[in-house]
Regions:
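Helix-turn-helix/homeodomain-like alpha-helical modules used for DNA recognition
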Residues: 83-103
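An N-terminal, helix-rich hydrophobic module
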Residues: 1-90
Length: 103
């Protein structure tokens, strides 16, 4: 999944769970996590404190965990995103199959 799709997917989750959209900092952190960067690397690249990046990340993980029903962490973030893409593709195929069967 490309980064723009990841951001849109997480923003949809954020809106569902909190009623708010992603901040610029959230998007920066998501991009860094998607690239596999450490909190320190994300912080250094964008002039943030690494503790702040960690806090923002954990906040995103909590929201994603609440929406998805299973724990999201820095260790499984990429796996979760990949899994969500697989599920999204399956849902599309099921909808297409149902549409064909209903004709």
């Amino acid at each position: 999944m490309d980064i723009e799709d990841v951001i849109l997917l997480i923003e949809k989750i954020m809106i569902n769970q909190t009623g708010r959209t992603l901040s610029d900092t959230d998007i920066t952190v998501i991009k860094g996590l998607h690239e596999g960067l450490t909190y320190s690397a994300i912080a250094e690249n964008h002039n943030y404190h690494d503790g702040y990046v960690g806090e923002k990340s954990r906040s995103l993980y909590r929201v994603m965990t609440a929406e998805l029903g299973y724990p999201v962490t820095k260790h499984n973030f990429r796996w979760v995103i990949d899994r969500m893409e697989i599920m999204r593709k399956r849902e599309r195929r099921v909808k297409q199959a149902r549409k064909r069967l209903s004709r």
